[in-house]
Amino acid sequence: MRQITDISQLKEAIKQYHSEGKSIGFVPTMGFLHEGHLTLADKARQENDAVIMSIFVNPAQFGPNEDFEAYPRDIERDAALAENAGVDILFTPDAHDMYPGEKNVTIHVERRTDVLCGRSREGHFDGVAIVLTKLFNLVKPTRAYFGLKDAQQVAVVDGLISDFFMDIELVPVDTVREEDGLAKSSRNVYLTAEERKEAPKLYRALQTSAELVQAGERDPEAVIKAAKDIIETTSGTIDYVELYSYPELEPVNEIAGKMILAVAVAFSKARLIDNIIIDIREMERI
């Protein structure tokens, strides 16, 4: 594995891959890698000739009340994990290289950002869109891999690729879970022992609602209530339980097409998110 920090060196490596006709799988991250990231790298390894992972803690996606400096960083640990996962190039640029001087052009994400977690993180997805546009232009990937754990981000990336006619295949990858269904997250370590026992109820709630739809329920409020009823048996505080079309993230008046049921729940020292994709068309084929 090569670790590259210099943009010009990355461009040379990409040029070489393209001259050899090699496909490139790209996994953008902010580092502090966990099993979810490594699953993305593994899938990219299976589907491409070369795998490039970036580690860049992007200052543009941190809000005024979010501590950019406190974000965990351990590049040596991450480099070892990336190499073991079969990554060919680990791109670790400096913020001064990614954002040299004043911006001449910026990006504002108009849709898909004012619901779910984006509602309380103004400007966050603008920062995501800016850095991904830069990274996509540098890496020129055949495919880009993102985890559905953050399904709203996947929806925003889908819109970015579509609106700017980027010749990139977006590959959403299912959430990696513990044996009891809890979505894997670095935040899980902040749960107390009792909260850790309760936390799998989030996914159980989502599954229950999906099963309700599969059984014929077509009232969005009933589907949402079924999930809420289960989550309310935990000690966590519900931030939201919401249902939207996917990936458009528009409100739904009836159960139809492809949708996302998403939840956010605050425990004493950890805020957990999870979601499930409900596709009526797929259910009708079963």
Curated annotation (Swiss-Prot):
One BP term from GO: pantothenate biosynthetic process
SUPFAM superfamilies: Nucleotidylyl transferase
Residues engaged in binding ATP: 30-37, 147-150, 176, 184-187
Sites where the protein binds (R)-pantoate: 61, 153
Catalytic reaction(s) noted: (R)-pantoate + beta-alanine + ATP = (R)-pantothenate + AMP + diphosphate + H(+)
Regions annotated as coiled coil: none
Annotated positions binding beta-alanine: 61
Function of the molecule: Catalyzes the condensation of pantoate with beta-alanine in an ATP-dependent reaction via a pantoyl-adenylate intermediate.
Protein's name in the database: Pantothenate synthetase
Organism for this UniProt entry: Bacillus subtilis (strain 168)
Encoding gene (name): panC
